[in-house]
């Protein structure tokens, strides 16, 4: 991942020209400690989950229950992708599930792209379900704390609409590839710690929900859970240290640090009040403004990638502390679902493209757009309409 060098280089440049002082840059990083802790803990949890074979079992489960039908298999792979996204994050879905799906498709001589696209598009669509399902959500909510109950009340319908619309659109787009049957699935690889790790991840999810409900930092939960999983795996003598270290996306941390410094410099130049003004206008326009804000966030996420856009949105929310939960969720609808339109819209999509290329599946940006456009549009439109409906009902 070379993007980290661009972000760090940009941060060095704004420091060199005096757009931000070293003290202010360091303060911006310390202020976001919860985001860094969450990501580090998440990457460790994902690496442990990959070693333990949990997702392998889920993938083979989908194959076993597809009834020999490719379309049913697509629905089940989408369901597995949604489950992995909600429990581990959208980045985990593309990192762990995509390689397994590609390998299984090749073993069974079925087209790869329908199921590979189910991984990446569902990773984005399902990441709206919970605040911890997407690192971008954590970034935004760090600057605009929304209680879990309020978040779920507003995001539940848009999330469900996006997931259903994505699956329906995938079935339509790949209808020609989904004709035909399936061979017998391969056996899932065995691992003595699968159950232990699965229970551990379930406990971490409950701890996430508890932390969100009372306003505690989720980064502390992620790091604590990661330490316990590593300790359990090590104590049983089943930790492959080399594979574990390689499975962590270390480059994301300097990438994010560089972005924090860049956005902090932009804030000092007056970005925060500008974004805050736009948020206030959207809130004043009711349900229509909420829908427009989601679409604007989707456009911004594709223009600059959703992580830096999440940082920009966070700066705006910090400058507008009175922003309500509907406004915050509207931003996240665009930030989570909008990136599905392009190959550069989200970190998950960038990782997914690299995984395909490493496995001999070159995919141009134009080909991606041609395939993903309808599912992405369906998901975003369904979520925006659902959000507008929820906002209108709440206003009355």
Language model: regions and residue ranges:
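Hydrophobic mid-bilayer segments of alpha-helices in multi-pass membrane transport proteins
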Residues: 1-20, 32-44, 197-205, 215-234, ...
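Membrane-interface alpha-helices at helix entry/exit sites of multi-pass transporters
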Residues: 68-76, 106-119, 146-157, 321-333, ...
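Interfacial loop-to-helix junctions that mark the boundaries of transmembrane helices
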Residues: 1, 24-35, 148-158, 190-193, ...
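Hydrophobic alpha-helical transmembrane segments in multi-pass integral membrane proteins
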Residues: 135, 205-212, 258-277, 382-388
